[in-house]
Curated annotation (Swiss-Prot):
It is found in: Cytoplasm. GO terms for cellular component: cytoplasm. Modulates RecA activity. The gene is recX. It comes from Shigella dysenteriae serotype 1 (strain Sd197). This is Regulatory protein RecX.
Length: 166
């Protein structure tokens, strides 16, 4: 730790660290808290910030007030990002839960997002297994297992073959 950083108050150092973290990408409040509490890797090894619980709360409140930290924005962007990567709603819900987002906030954001999960599952399956999708049972099971692993719901997966038969 340099002499100039050791003289800065813990609140200022925490605030600087929070803004740097949030400048890279959106985080949930729980993620930001976890990263702020973690020791900083300095030139001479891990460095602790001598901050109180009140300092952490003030930093989180400041980030909320100035629009740097917004869980609803984080959830909307996270859903859009993960769906573009081919993940289904079940997997996205689980990941948001792990990031400390409440079930109510997740469900609200899932209802508000304009994503056709069935079409997304079909696109993902055709990218992996080519068009036309197989109708042989053993091949269908393989695709079904793949899509379930990616987090798609069984009803969306079954709709692929229902729509395919039409």
């Amino acid at each position: 730790m340099t002499e100039s950083t050791s003289r800065r108050p813990a609140y200022a150092r925490l605030l600087d660290r929070a803004v740097r973290i949030l400048a890279v990408r959106d985080h949930s409040e729980q993620e930001l808290r976890r990263k702020l509490v973690a020791p900083i890797m300095g030139k001479n090894g891990p460095e602790e910030i001598d901050a109180t619980a009140e300092d952490y709360e003030r930093v989180i409140a400041w980030c909320h007030e100035h629009g740097y930290l917004d869980d609803s924005r984080f959830v909307a962007r996270f859903i859009a990002s993960r769906s573009r990567k081919g993940y289904g709603p079940a997997r996205i819900r689980q990941e948001l839960n792990q990031k400390g987002i409440s079930r109510e906030a997740t469900e609200k954001a899932m209802r508000e997002c304009d994503i056709d999960w069935c079409a997304l599952a079909r696109d993902h399956a055709t990218r992996k297994y080519d068009e036309p999708l197989p109708t042989v049972f053993s091949e269908k099971v393989k695709i079904q297992r793949f899509l379930l692993y990616r987090g798609y719901l069984m009803e969306d997966i079954q709709d692929i073959w229902r729509n395919f038969a039409d």
